[in-house]
UniProtKB/Swiss-Prot annotation:
It comes from the Bacteria. It comes from Salmonella schwarzengrund (strain CVM19633). InterPro entries: YaaA. The gene is yaaA. Belongs to the UPF0246 family. This is UPF0246 protein YaaA.
Amino acid sequence: MLILISPAKTLDYQSPLATTRYTQPELLDHSQQLIQQARQLSAPQISRLMGISDKLADLNATRFHDWQPHFTPDNARQAILAFKGDVYTGLQAETFNDADFDFAQQHLRMLSGLYGVLRPLDLMQPYRLEMGIRLENPRGKDLYQFWGDIITDKLNEALEAQGDRVVVNLASEEYFKSVKPKKLNAELIKPVFLDEKNGKFKVVSFYAKKARGLMSRFIIENRLTKPEQLTAFDREGYFFDEETSTKDELVFKRYEQ
């Protein structure tokens, strides 16, 4: 079973590390090409392209400039411990033990605009380059064209290595668009998290993101390998709703607190 999650805009390079183990990202040659492209942008261009403040644009222009492909624990950090958004609040990788990291390294992948695909222990230098950004590059008009089949091929390699054919899609639409489902050698399962609001169940972005992290942690902690095991997910008040679920879309609901 391979779990896919999105990266986060918020990064943490200060907190104590839960592990000293690390690996190197596998697609750095491609990342380097994107960095060369991004370095041609001025801070005001970055601000317009990404829709961010001048201060953030300056920070990211500096990050692009400082980025260099020789990653060490001194200039980079394991991806699963560097990302700090809502998904990662639910995941709480900072509390993983060695066996959790082992399972995650085999079964969890983070999709990334700059790095393509990251394993949890892959070192990563700080960046901001969201998958949906229209950064023109030698391969096309945006990052989807840049990555083409590369991300899908890398996921197929991971599936081959672990010997099963199930992908649990816990990534956002923006990021999952970088995967070619028809070329993926796997059964696709998408958990959906609905929260009750004024008597109606709907996707509430903040809660849904955190729930994706909670589900990822649930799979890792319990070493789950079969799709039918996912329906037991019951963290923080969620329950499986068999009636509205299908074989490839598992619906989890939570009553208003």
